[in-house]
Amino acid sequence: MEHYISLFVKAVFIENLALSFFLGMCTFLAVSKKVTTSIGLGVAVIVVLGISVPVNNLVYHAVLAPGSLTWLGYPDADLSFLRFLTFIGVIAALVQILEMALDKFFPALYNALGIFLPLITVNCAIFGAVSFMVERNYNFGESVVYGIGAGVGWALAITLLAGIREKMKYSDVPDGLRGLGITFITVGLMALGFMSFSGISL
């Protein structure tokens, strides 16, 4: 149990996808203007990562990994070269299902997210988490914990940034730094803050 707790904490704080690896920056910077929208997108990313990482883990180990087709009589088969296409296909299907669910049950959030919801399909944070799962050879249980933890970490980062940006609307920001300029500086300072967690050994 301790292993899974430490894996979750590492995914949220120490190896934060947004602030340690700078993945998903396009959506991270574009949607982080309002806290409510950021929370909505953060929840969507948690759901997509929490499902896509373990599902892709199953697909990889059952079909794509070297020797995984032994049960079909092909012990030497290695389909790992197809993993990028397969992972993107699985992620795209899950995002499409999520998009339809939000459109039906949460139309206000669906309209607020706009084009950035389907862009989760090609969000490098999603694909990066799935790639890390393969690279680190996580089992199914670890992939579930890591997927949820990575999603929570990304959601935490975008919500914190949105809160800061809302406060900065009332600040006296120099003209040359208004907009994305001060946002980049803020993200860099947040990343420095999260870097302090790297000294924790779990």
Curated annotation (Swiss-Prot):
One of its GO terms (cellular component) is plasma membrane. It is found in: Cell inner membrane. InterPro entries: NqrDE/RnfAE, NqrDE/RnfAE_oxidrdctase, NqrE. The chain crosses the membrane at residues 11-31, 35-55, 81-101, 114-134, 144-164, 180-200. Its main location: membrane. It catalyses: a ubiquinone + n Na(+)(in) + NADH + H(+) = a ubiquinol + n Na(+)(out) + NAD(+). The keyword Cell inner membrane applies. Keywords: Cell inner membrane, Cell membrane, Ion transport, Membrane, NAD, Sodium, Sodium transport, Translocase, Transmembrane, Transmembrane helix, Transport, Ubiquinone. It is a multi-pass membrane protein. NQR complex catalyzes the reduction of ubiquinone-1 to ubiquinol by two successive reactions, coupled with the transport of Na(+) ions from the cytoplasm to the periplasm. NqrA to NqrE are probably involved in the second step, the conversion of ubisemiquinone to ubiquinol. Composed of six subunits; NqrA, NqrB, NqrC, NqrD, NqrE and NqrF. Belongs to the NqrDE/RnfAE family. This is Na(+)-translocating NADH-quinone reductase subunit E. It comes from Pseudoalteromonas translucida (strain TAC 125). The lineage of its organism: Bacteria, Pseudomonadati, Pseudomonadota, Gammaproteobacteria, Alteromonadales.
